[in-house]
């Protein structure tokens, strides 16, 4: 099943707390169906979401209508009321979020307020329910593309810098050492794109916008 939670609706883009589950085998003709799910504790849009073991989902951060950025987080479950968990040190809207092989969750970069972005990276421990900081990104950035690599490391590519510069740089987080290190540059500045790890271990970075803020149909 697929969880869709939060977001914004209406003329004023008001955040919602509702969730919806998509069942690909549901419906009369088994073409898929949507059903209502357990609501979040806090209405939020642009939150980070990562599936944890045992059908739990970490929902962290996000924002409300008035551009207040949340550091709070909660654990969503399909059958019971959500449970509040530890808070992040800063907000990470439009950052990168990835589940690591050790079960922890990496949340890095993103927007921390209506005037600044961050290089801070944090790890969520689902056992203790707490966040702790780890090695930061090389610079503050948001709207990056992120992908988990086959060996458990995490690629962070492109995005926007704190001076609104369009980035081609990329870096890799190694959970074994707890550090970020430089990687190759994208041939094209790209922000707001997506990254997908392929079966051969390579990463496809596609779509997003270029340095002129024009939509891209290309891929690297």
What are these regions (language model features)?
Residues 1-220:
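Kelch-like beta-propeller repeat domains
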């Amino acid at each position: 099943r697929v969880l869709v939670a939060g977001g914004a609706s209406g003329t004023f883009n008001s955040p919602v707390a509702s969730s919806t589950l998509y069942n690909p085998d549901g419906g009369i003709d088994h073409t898929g169906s949507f059903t209502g799910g357990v609501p979040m504790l806090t209405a939020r849009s642009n939150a980070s979401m990562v599936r944890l073991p045992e059908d739990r989902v970490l929902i962290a951060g996000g924002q409300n209508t008035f551009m207040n950025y949340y550091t709070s987080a909660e654990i969503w479950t399909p059958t019971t009321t959500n449970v509040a968990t530890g808070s992040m040190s800063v907000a990470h809207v439009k950052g990168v979020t990835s589940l690591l092989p050790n079960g922890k969750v990496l949340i890095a970069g993103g927007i921390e307020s209506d005037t600044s972005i961050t290089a801070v990276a944090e790890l969520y421990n689902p056992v203790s329910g707490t966040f702790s900081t780890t090695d930061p990104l090389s610079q503050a950035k948001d709207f990056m593309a992120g992908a988990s690599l086959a060996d458990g490391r995490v690629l962070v590519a492109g995005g926007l810098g704190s001076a609104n510069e369009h980035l081609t740089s990329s870096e890799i987080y190694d959970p074994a050492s707890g550090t970020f290190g430089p990687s190759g540059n994208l041939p094209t500045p790209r922000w707001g794109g997506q990254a997908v790890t392929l079966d051969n271990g390579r990463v496809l970075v596609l779509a997003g916008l270029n340095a002129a803020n024009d939509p891209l149909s290309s891929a690297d």
